[in-house]
Amino acid sequence: MNTISQKSYAKINLNLNVVGKTKNLHKLQSIVSLISLYDEISLRQIDSRKHKILFKGKFSKTINSRNTIYKTLSILDKEKLLKKKYLVMVKKNIPVKSGMGGGSMNAATLIKIFMKNKIIKINKKKLQKINDSIGQDVKLGFSKNIMYLDGNNSVKILNKKTKYFLLLFMPKYVCSTKYIFSKVKKYSKPLKNIKNKFNNLGSLKNDLQDIVIKKIQS
């Protein structure tokens, strides 16, 4: 097969409320959008006993071997969905540990490549199970529209085709998502009709912001 390439877009939380926690996951309310910053993923079949994964680019140096691409391929193999082995090449343009879901979006993009080219065939229920096995944010990579998380781990689509300008700053500091959520001690009161708040984003907040600032200043 020829090499197949696809863009893997970053996501951004335009607000984020931590409204509670289940046994394993925090419950989030958030308006989420994909943005024009993207990684580039290429895939081709290889004659090998194992899959091969190659990262390159400015933000590739700190990615470990147990990354989301590795995890995705391992799960698809375990489910006996892949009959061949593949070389996956990822050019990293999305900063690592930036909160923009680079790893999760890469996993989603890889699955979409497999599905689009009929390498794997899975129904919606199976896809949801696989996505959740990889990571909580993977499902966000399957929509081009602005989305919102309703606080119960469900993704809803906002029926808005809105263009907006976004200015991104890349600080010198990194802070892992796992660490940030481990420091959440208080929960916000759930917002009503969060999907109607899009036109007034200035009134919303990010519950994780103060935790990150405190970490940087310590």
Predicted segments with their positions:
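ATP-binding N-lobe of GHMP and related small-molecule kinases
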Residues: M1-S98, M115-K125, M170
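Short, glycine/charged-enriched secondary-structure capping and boundary segments
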Residues: L28-Q29, S104, S182-V184
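Conserved, helical-rich catalytic subdomain that frames metal- and/or nucleotide-binding sites
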Residues: H51-I53, S143, M147-S218
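A short, flexible low-complexity segment enriched in Lys/Arg and Gly/Pro that occurs
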Residues: Y70-K85, K112, G202-S218
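DPxDG-like acidic metal-binding loop motif
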Residues: S98-L127, L140-F142
